[in-house]
Each structure stands twice: as C-alpha cells, then as structure tokens.
Amino acid sequence: MSTKTARVQAYFAVAQMNYGEDISLAQVVAVHRGAFSAQITQGSDVKGDVVVAVTLATPGNCTDHPLWPPVVGDWVALADATQNHGEAAAHAVEIMPRTSYIERPAASGFGLSQAIAANVDELVIVEPLQPAFSIGRVERFVAIAHASAIRARVVLTKADLVADQEIQGAIEQCAPLVDSVTALNTTDTQAVAGLKESFTPGDTLVLVGRSGAGKSTLTNALLGTSLATGKVRAADGKGRHTTTSRQLLQGEVNIIDTPGIRALGATPDAEAVDQTFTQIAALAEQCRYRDCSHSGEPGCAVGQALTQGDLSPEVLERYQRMRRESERNELNRDARLARQSQRAASRDNTRGRRETMRLKGRGN
C-alpha cells in the first residue's frame, strides 16, 4: 500500500469516526464561484466518474473551519451524497489536513494571495523559450515551491522555435534552481513520453506559467485529454487564458491545470527566497554583519564575490528585488491578518453580549 493510499484511508476512518458510517470522502476537482465539484472515492454509491456538486453556502458546511474554503486537491468529508438523473450533490462537513498548500502572491504588493491547490507533490513550471524566456519568473515560482515545501521542476516549451544555444543557456540557468529541467516541443510525442516517464506514478502535479506557455497542450499530451488550447499572437508571443479555472485531471499522474499568470508577486516567505538563491544565501553566512543587506557594507562576502566575478550582478539584483518585495508582502499580510482577527473578535464579542442580554430578557 502506498503512503498516499494509506493517508486517504486514514482520512476516511477519521471522517467516519467523527460523522458516522454514512459519511463519504471526496477530492475537490474544480472550484467555482459559490460551489465546488468533488469526486467521491470512498463511502458512497455515488463514486467513480461521477462528479458531485457541492454548494459552499449549504447549511452544515464547515465555514468556520481554519482551512475553509476548499481548494482544488483538497480531501473533504461529504454528507448526504445523492444522485438523481445523473446529477449528484452533497454538502461538505470537513476539510481533511493538507500535506501541502500552494498560493500565488498577488503582484499588487498588499500581501494578498490567491489559492492555487492543495495536496500537491510537485510544481511544474512551464516556461516558453519563445518569445522571451524569463529566469526571473522561474525564480519566483521556485520560491513558491520552497514556501510550500514541495518539489519543483521546469519544462521549457517551444524548443523547436529557438536555437540549440538558447536552449542550453536556459537549461543552465534553471538547473541550479530545481530538481529537473526538460526542454521540448509539446507536440513531440516521443519527448512528452520521456517526460511522462520521469514523473512518479500517483503523484499530483500542478502546472503553472504565463498565458500561452503551453500548459493545456502539455496536459493534453500527458493525459490524452482534450482541454481547450489557444493561439498565441505572433507579435508578442502572448496567449489567451484558455484555462479559466483550476481543475484536477486524473490519470497515471494527477495534473492540476491552472490559468496563465501575467504578473507574479514575491512569496511573503523570505526564507523561501533565500532557499531559491542558494549561492547568495551561502555567501551571506560569511558576511561580517548578520543583517547585511549586501549593498556595500564592509565585510560583505556577497559584495566580494560580485567584485571578483564569482556572482552575477543580475542575479544579485533579482534576489534583492524579490527579498525586498517578500519582506514587504510579509508585513502587509501580517497586518491584514491582524485586522481580520480583530474584526472576528469584535463580532464574537457582539454576539456574546447579545446572547447575554437575550438570556436576561433584555434583548429583542
């Protein structure tokens, strides 16, 4: 029995213990506005290929749960699963503990973020070689993977449109950052088959990248599905959002396809940024001052490496920019969470006072 199978069975056992024998266990495969779709795997006759519609506002949902709302990849306990004329419905009572949680920082700089997926094993960064490969975008995605404590790999698409020298240069830039780098043309069946063999069977992957990178085309090739794919403008290489919502597609590996990202903020986890720029992080430990900003301080090992030509100034610039943005996002996030906590406490106090007055016969 695999670790993942054992974990799912443990989830089901806990759900039955908490809610009774009639409970079902399902995995969220898509999230919609005000609802989500889930696929029941255990505990109900409504299972298999049937997708269950779950309305978020249904009474009994776990809206006070710390993990709420559910995201694609979540395992949820469902009650009252029914099927009528091919339409299945249920309501959620609990979100099971997550092994990982990925969120995308907004580019606004206000500490906001958007959930991408949960229970993911590997982040697959799909980066096109044409029209313009961006190592900065790759680095930001890698930092998100570190913040989520999951593996990361890079798939460089449109390799048929650039020279071998450009491909090799991109591979060399990506290789120190991730576990694996592959350059291919997504219509090359042999290359895609080789990529597919490198994935661990049963793993859940999430594909991320800019619009027009080829995420949906790659998903179709890996799973034999038929997601909509869009044309890319010749002028700037930009594509349309052919994937407009996150969805989990199941096969030998489970793939979560996501909408394209036009602008990507820095993760509010500064340590994850350091884990991405390992050369700078290692040099920083040799700096004279612990809080060295690597901006000309005496005894700065990073500055010395820069002077000696052992560190690229472009790499240092990208690191410092992302680190500053990360620290700012962390402060903004913490302030926003503190305000939310204060508002929640105020609401609870108001409810408490009203209940006390009601019990005393003074309320309405």
Regions found by a protein language model. Give the residues of each.
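Conserved beta-strand/loop subsegment of P-loop NTPase cores
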Residues: 120-126, 149-159, 179-183
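Walker A/P-loop
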Residues: 216
